[in-house]
Swiss-Prot record:
Ranges for region Shikimate dehydrogenase: 1277-1567
Molecular function (Gene Ontology), one example: 3-dehydroquinate dehydratase activity
Pfam families in UniProt: DHQ_synthase, DHQS_C, DHquinase_I, EPSP_synthase, SDH_C, Shikimate_DH, Shikimate_dh_N, SKI
Name of the protein in question: Pentafunctional AROM polypeptide
Length: 1567
């Protein structure tokens, strides 16, 4: 009950007292004087959060102190905002603070804030000194209408929200509506959920007002705030009505049931499920947002239980959505806010089990029976099975329908008629009442779109069963915002013509129509062609012939003759027909291209147009021509939408397949819908009894299993019903052929293929026909137990298979249960209620299987652009080799097709213009027909043609890759000055480059700046890594996630070029290197791109690309957002692996970067160098939430004052990781924060002693962190060994122990001399075993002691390295044998200038000897591409045995005599590996062969000839001398020893040390 004292505030009575006071502007003077006069105390404690303090507290203090004088004191305390603060820790902090300020029992606490403040401070008041007085001053809409009223106070616990608390009534609730002026939009909308809830349970009139006022409220709250409070002035009265209405209802309920005996539970509508969602999704999703989703789910639950009409559910959902609140977890905002976090049904039910309303284990939920009315005056007990069905994404159908069942089912309104009725009513003049309208996603999108175009206003009557539309006679206005149409194909096609009728506004001259991913591939081309031909400008914004499209607002198309291809969709025809009366002259619509599809739907449109006052004439001579007069629609007083005949096929089919009876009471012979013939044309021939009147249809199925196949049925008049017919045919005797349904391939999915694939899961054979499907039935008892049925997000697929499931011999799991909402949201309810089918809700099992294997990659073709001479052909060749894709040089391909060279084409009469035209046509052909699996190198001048630029831009905007290859401009110019093979430029080369440069950048989405001076045959390592990023094949992120400790080193140099000598040393032990762009000496885009290229080449590890602003501890200007975005885009274009994105950047920057990131991983960061935030409370939560939305990695960096701050950080991080698995880098800067760096674990930023400065205070090196980890027990020391005999003089301990020390690892490497493998069995299985090197004589003997052996070691037949590995997800350690000898050989040869051989550059190799090392040498030469591989040895038998043990493609040959050498002139070796002992003379016959081979003249002076000596002693062997005398380069054996040990270290530790350090340790004093 409310009362008002004249001009004063309005008061609401609660528990017999007028303690709720509502008005604008009461916070300062009124509250102060009311407190001092009516709630006197010596101490008032005002508690608020840090967001509100500065805005509202100082002014209140001033007024209060002036009014109170010396009689009372006012203390203030602030806490961090957000749900995170609402816990035991914060409550204790407040209580301790109050005690320290001598607060006693007369204290009055003022809770200023939203729900968190009110709930928790109320609980403080309830328990402090066994209870003190408090007042609520709610500042959010949600708190004003809900949480501040009723005395429920509480804190959250890990088990759930509000589980510890007390009933403690406030002495006053001061609701100052002026607080809403500064309330953020999202918070305001959050509060509207509680307002809607109250109206939904209590007052339909108020609910209707909420529906009507949604546009005005949203417009007001989205307007810019001003100091005068004008933002909400237009809705001031509406706001007061909303707050008084909701607060009044709550006060009334609380007064009747203060302690929640039953009635007060009604206020929990939406909360049973909403709180469960909130427990999982907090703090990313707000309370009201969770309640909004909860209300929809609980309304669906009431509908499933049969107590709430479908129309009421639709109306509630529409109202919630109209306030931009989410209605499901699939809402794109919720997905973004929570990073797609799952809400498992079992967890939701567990959370629902901890609810104060419950009766023991029985769950209680508030059920609606109508809008404004609940099913019971309390929460109702609902079984878990029903709740599980509503919450689950999938449903398991148990077969079986009661015998003799006879039911009547009224399907929802026809989607086809509903959408047409909405379009006609919106364009009509006057008011019409539409009854039986389909409540579905499609009609929801249509209604929303019509409202956006301001074409009509609408309201609901009769509990949502009647839609009242007031049309404006076709006066539509273009929309600023795109019309989002989901997957609603009907709406998209109808509205494409309708928006052409729009008039332009001051702010826009066109309207964009868009939809979801599937909608963006569905065809709309013929309709657009027809509109374009009639003067309407329509532009495709993405894929040609599909949405999104931009349609100019031309106030109606020209009219006259319009030709339209109608063989794909009749909706194109209906779209033009309905808009035609508003054309500028009468329309003659000619359908061309063959027989129109679905003529029945065209006839339906014409009949409905007549109902709205426009009569279409069909041409007497040409039945495919229609004459539409000018005019305007006149809305009939009432229009009744008959049930959807396509949907009616499902209940009728259930009757048919189960031998029961079903009646559809409102579809009969006179129906406008073609699908109404389904019962007569399909079910009757299949053996059903069909009775049909003008307005009803009744079907009785034959005995179970007695359905008959139909040899052939043309379903062109009812194409949507073919899916229902197909599932019946699956259990019919014989083969059914269905034709006339070609259009079903371009519906929500390719339905013909979908039916074929899903029926195959039941063991039913189907064949696709050109325009249909053939189904061979089988006895229903023989149907297979199917895999889960995938529905392709297609409502008709889901409902069809639900029909088959009621007869299948096994339970059937149908995925994507909710897709039926498109046309029949309550289908599963009907199946359960009417047909008594047992349903069970289930999770989607396929998600668990595919989650890990879903790393994205792309097989889209890559187009390479750039100046002539920039290296496109070279890069294309590299790319082709790496990706194993064909390379097509478009210039070469053009010459092939034209049968003339490019200069010849240009010199001909065709000239440059003809050449460019041919070039463009070739590009179009390649994009259209070879868009996958190719690499294309484009001509340098291709970008001169605007049409070519548009093609490339469109290609990369739609997921393709266009790569700009560039190198130093001076190098390119010099090359082109020398190149005489191409047409000469008619202008200065440099001018050409600078003219084309912006075009190259415009058409490309990636760029590779080559730091290399020549185009080598082999792709350099930096290019391979760049390509792995842009193609999505890089596994670096997954690799570092799997490591317990990973690091990136922060590079603090102003110019990478000047630090190239130290970079290899600096990056040792790190997994990535950070380029601090803000510290570079120039931010010129080309300079920055070059820095990336140089760093990638020098560091050989992934790059973290960072721009750190001044306020976050860097050097980049805080507000230079435009430049920041340009620099971010350079990072993305250059394919960096990681990009650090500051969360303080504006939304448009964050959005642009994340939408164009490709395969780069975003590190969403926030730094707090001024120590404003605390890990202990919720201060970091807003930044974590934002980072969760935008980042693949979250990076939060605070400042530590004392060591204990690191423990608070660890607790925070653990809490966040429990809720979301997204990796977190969380650190404290400063000396006291070093411990946080030690314990961080994932990608810890580190420094290096060789760097000029540290990137942040307190930063450590990777080696220092490893040392610290060892000290605190986080990194256990491991023992490594060398096994073999003799080994006493081995250099391996010096190598490995030296590297352990350099990298900070606490491990020890020692010798274990033995020639018996069994001696090491216990060692390699000990807990502290880290790995082992194995030498003679154990390389073969150790294999049986291992769990697995690498492919290389298997081929070589020897193991020289043992590595303990733990498979992912397993605690068990397995021992893997590998061989690094061959790796060492390859590395040493590569270092000496040997390049891998290719098919275009073949070469022979040679191995000397036939001992154990020979096999590794053969393997190494094969890896380098050498063929043939000659072996020179004493024993031909041993050589043959070696050759036989390798595959034939190794091409191993024996050289036994100098004559054989002479005969092999064309295949003599350029690489020789010697594996014979060096301390004995070389066998004479072998020596002769070697002399002949080594002294043979070199083919080319440029090509190096190298001999690799595997013997260690003496360091310079006779064979080396022999080779050197013949002009060969030689490599001593110690080089290979160092290299193979270097590889061993990497395999054991995951750390790549400098090779120079490994080499120095091995060489010792020998150099």
């Amino acid at each position: 009950m409310t009362s008002s004292t004249g001009s004063g505030p309005t008061r609401i009575s609660i528990l017999g007292k007028d303690d709720i006071i509502v008005d604008h502007g009461i916070w300062l003077d009124f509250v102060t004087h009311d407190l001092l006069q009516n709630i006197p105390s010596s101490t008032y404690v005002l508690i608020t959060d840090t967001n509100l303090h500065d805005t509202y507290v100082p002014a209140f203090q001033e007024v209060f102190e002036r009014a109170a004088g010396q009689d009372a004191r006012l203390l203030t305390y602030t806490i961090p905002p957000g749900e995170y603060s609402k816990g035991r820790e914060t409550k204790a902090e407040i209580e301790d603070w109050m005690l320290s300020h001598q607060c006693t029992r007369d204290t009055v606490i003022i809770a200023l804030g939203g729900g968190v403040i009110g709930d928790m401070i109320g609980y403080v008041a309830a328990t402090f000194m066994r209870g003190v007085r408090f007042v609520q001053v709610p500042t959010t809409l949600l708190a004003m209408v809900d949480s501040s009223i009723g005395g429920k106070t509480a804190i959250d616990t890990p088990m759930g929200k509000n589980l510890v608390g007390a009933f403690w009534q406030p002495r006053r609730i001061y609701i100052d509506l002026a607080f809403l002026e500064t309330l953020p939009v999202r918070e305001f909308i959050n509060g509207m959920a509680e307002v809607i809830k109250t109206a939904a349970i209590w007052n339909e009139t108020e609910f209707t007002a909420l529906e009507d006022n949604a546009p005005a409220i949203l417009e007001a709250i989205r307007s810019k705030p001003t100091g005068t409070g004008a933002r909400l002035a237009p809705i001031r009265d509406i706001l007061k009505r909303i707050v008084l209405g909701s607060a009044g209802v709550k006060a009334e309920v609380v007064s009747a049931d203060e302690r929640e005996g039953g009635l007060r539970n009604l206020l929990n509508f939406g909360h049973s499920i909403g709180h469960a969602y909130e427990a999982i999704l907090t703090p990313q999703v707000l309370h009201g947002e969770c309640v909004a989703i909860g209300m929809v789910r609980e309304a669906e639950l009431a509908r499933f239980l049969g107590v709430l009409p479908p129309g009421a559910v639709a109306r509630l959902t529409k109202c919630i959505a109209s306030y931009e609140l989410p209605t499901s977890l699939h809402d794109k905002r919720i997905v973004k806010l929570t990073a797609g976090k799952e809400c498992p049904v079992d967890v939701l039910l567990q959370k629902m089990g901890v609810d104060k309303k419950n009766d023991g284990r029985k769950k209680k939920v508030v059920l609606l029976s109508a809008i404004g009315k609940t099913y019971e005056p309390k929460a109702t007990v609902v079984e878990d099975r029903a709740i599980r069905i509503v919450l689950s994404p999938s449903v398991r159908v148990t077969p079986g329908v009661p015998k003799g069942l006879n039911v009547s089912v009224t399907p929802p309104g026809s989607k086809s008629i509903s959408n047409r009725a909405l379009v006609l009513a919106a364009m009509g003049e006057g008011t019409t009442r539409i009854k039986g309208l389909l409540h579905s996603d499609d009609t929801h999108y249509m209604l929303t779109a019509i409202a956006q175009l301001q074409g009509a206003t609408y309201t609901w009557e009769e509990a949502g069963e009647v839609l009242v539309v007031k049309g404006r006679g076709g006066k539509l206005l273009a929309s600023n915002e795109p019309l989002y149409l989901g997957n609603a194909g009907t709406a998209s096609r109808f509205l494409t013509s309708v928006v052409a009728l729009c008039s332009p506004t001051d702010t826009t001259t066109s309207t964009v129509l868009t939809g979801n991913a599937r909608m963006k591939v569905r065809p709309i081309g013929p309709l657009v062609d027809a509109l374009r031909s009639n003067g309407v400008a329509v532009k495709y914004l993405e894929k040609e012939n599909s949405l999104p499209v931009q349609v100019d607002a031309v106030s109606g198309f020209a009219g006259g003759v319009i030709e339209l291809a109608a063989t794909i969709s009749s909706q194109y025809v209906s779209s033009i027909l309905m808009a035609a009366p508003y054309a500028r002259q009468p329309v003659v619509l000619k359908l061309v291209g063959g027989k129109p599809i679905s003529q029945f739907y065209i006839d339906m449109t014409i009949a409905m147009m007549a109902s709205f006052g426009v009569k279409v004439e069909r041409d007497a001579e040409d039945p495919n021509t229609y004459h539409i007069p000018q005019g305007s629609y006149k809305n009939p007083e009432e229009y009744v939408v008959e049930s959807d005949a396509s949907s009616a096929t499902y209940p009728l089919a259930v009757a048919a397949i189960t031998g029961t009876t079903c009646t559809i009471p409102n579809i009969g012979r006179t129906s406008l819908q073609g699908d109404a013939r389904f019962a007569v044309d399909v079910l009757r021939p299949m053996g059903c009894t069909v009775e049909q009147t003008d307005t009803s249809t009744t079907v009785t199925g034959p005995p179970v299993g007695a359905l008959k196949a139909i040899p052939h049925v043309d379903m062109e008049p009812m194409t949507d019903a073919f899916l229902t017919a197909s599932v019946l045919a699956a259990v019919a005797s014989g083969t059914t052929q269905i034709t006339g349904i070609a259009n079903q391939r371009v519906k929500e999915c390719n339905r013909i293929k979908a039916m074929k694939d899903e029926l195959a899961k039941f063991g039913v054979h189907c064949s696709e026909l050109e325009d249909g499907i053939e189904v061979t039935g089988k006895p229903y008892k023989e149907l297979a137990n199917p895999e889960p049925i995938y529905c392709y997000d297609d409502h008709r697929v889901a409902m069809s298979f639900s029909v088959l499931s009621v007869l299948a011999p096994h339970k059937v799991l149908i995925l994507e249960r909710e897709c039926t909402a498109k046309t029949w949201p309550g289908w599963w309810d009907i199946l359960s209620q009417k047909f008594n089918v047992h349903l069970e809700g289930e999770e989607d099992p396929t998600k668990k299987c595919t989650a890990k294997s879903s790393r994205p990659s792309t097989d889209r073709s890559i187009f390479i652009v750039g100046m002539r001479g920039a290296g496109k052909s070279t890069a294309g060749r590299w790319m082709s080799d790496i990706l194993k894709r064909p390379l097509i040089d478009l210039d070469v391909e053009l010459e092939k097709r034209e049968k003339a060279t490019i200069p010849e084409i240009i010199r001909s009469e065709r000239g440059w213009e003809g050449f460019r035209k041919a070039e463009l046509e070739l590009l179009e052909d390649m994009i259209k027909n070879n868009s996958k699996g190719h690499v294309f190198s484009c001509g340098g001048g291709l970008v001169e043609t605007e049409a070519a630029r548009k093609l490339l831009i469109s290609y990369q905007k739609n997921g393709g890759s266009v790569l700009l290859v560039h190198r130093d401009t001076d190098q390119v110019v010099e090359y082109l000055m020398r190149d005489k093979t191409r047409p000469a430029y008619s202008e200065n080369i440099r001018e050409v480059y600078y003219r084309r440069k912006p075009w190259f950048e415009e058409v490309s989405n990636f760029q590779y700046h080559s730091p290399h001076h020549n185009g080598s045959e082999e792709a350099p390592e930096d290019f391979s890594r760049f390509l792995s990023v842009i193609s999505g094949s890089s596994t670096h992120f997954e690799d570092v996630l799997a490591k317990k400790h990973s690091f990136f080193v922060s590079l603090t140099v102003p110019n990478v070029a000047k630090a190239l000598d130290i970079i290899p040393k600096v990056v040792v032990g790190s997994d990535a290197v950070e380029l601090r762009v803000d510290l570079l000496e120039s931010l010129n885009p080309e300079f920055v791109a070059t820095q990336v290229a140089l760093l990638r080449s020098a560091a050989k590890i992934p790059i973290v690309y960072t721009i750190r602003t001044i306020s976050q501890g860097g050097k980049f200007p805080d507000d230079d957002y435009k430049r920041a975005l340009e620099l971010y885009q350079i990072g993305l274009r250059t394919g960096v692996e990681y990009l650090d994105l500051e969360m303080t950047m504006p939304e448009d920057v964050l959005q642009t970067v994340t939408e164009t990131k490709g395969f780069t991983h975003i590190i969403a960061s926030h730094h707090d160098p001024e120590n404003k935030l605390s890990w202990k409370n919720g201060g970091w939560i807003p930044f974590y939430n934002k980072a969760l939305q935008y980042g693949d990695v979250i990076k939060l960096v605070g400042m530590a004052r004392e060591v204990s701050d690191n423990f608070d950080l660890t607790n925070f991080k653990m809490r966040m990781l429990e809720a979301h698995k997204k990796p977190i880098i969380a650190l404290n800067m400063g000396t006291a924060g070093k411990l946080s760096r030690v314990l961080n674990g994932f990608l810890t930023p580190v420094s290096h002693p060789a760097l000029p400065s540290k990137a942040a205070p307190g930063q450590l090196s990777a080696a220092e962190i490893r040392q610290a980890l060892s000290l605190v027990g986080e990194l256990e020391p491991k023992s490594f060994y060398l096994f073999g005999k003799p080994i006493s003089s081995s250099r391996s301990p010096a190598l490995h122990n030296g590297l352990f020390a350099q990298t900070g690892l606490p491990h020890q490497y020692s010798l274990f001399e033995t020639d018996v493998a069994a001696d090491v069995k216990d060692i390699i299985r000990s807990a502290d075993f880290g790995g082992a090197s194995v030498t003679i004589p154990l390389k073969l003997d150790i294999i049986p002691l291992l769990d697995e052996v690498s492919d290389a070691a298997t081929a070589i037949g020897a193991v020289n390295t043992v590595i303990p590995v733990s498979p992912e997800g397993s605690d068990k350690t397995i021992l893997r044998g590998d061989n690094t000898d061959w790796m060492g050989m390859v590395f040493s040869l590569r270092q000496a200038g040997i390049a891998p051989r290719t098919k275009t550059n073949p070469g022979a190799g040679m191995v000397v000897g036939s001992g154990g090392t020979t096999r590794a040498a053969v393997y190494a030469l094969h890896d380098l591409g050498y063929s043939p591989i000659h072996i020179v040895a004493r024993s031909p038998d041993r050589v043959k045995a070696i050759a036989d043990s390798f595959p034939e493609d190794y091409n191993i040959q024996t050289l036994s005599t100098p004559e054989e050498v002479k005969a092999a002139t064309d295949a003599l070796p350029t690489v020789v590996i010697s594996s014979i002992p060096a301390d004995k003379p070389i066998d004479q016959s072998m020596r002769e062969v070697l002399v002949a081979s080594l002294r043979h003249p070199a083919k080319s002076e440029k090509e190096p000839r190298v001999l690799l000596e595997m013997a260690y002693t003496p360091r310079h062997t006779p064979l080396m001398q022999l080779a050197e005398d013949a002009g060969w380069k030689t490599i001593p054996g110690l080089e290979v020893l160092a290299a193979q040990g270097w590889y061993q270290f990497q395999l054991w530790t995951g750390v790549t040390p400098l090779y120079a350090d490994a080499r120095a340790a091995v060489m010792g004093d020998s150099e």
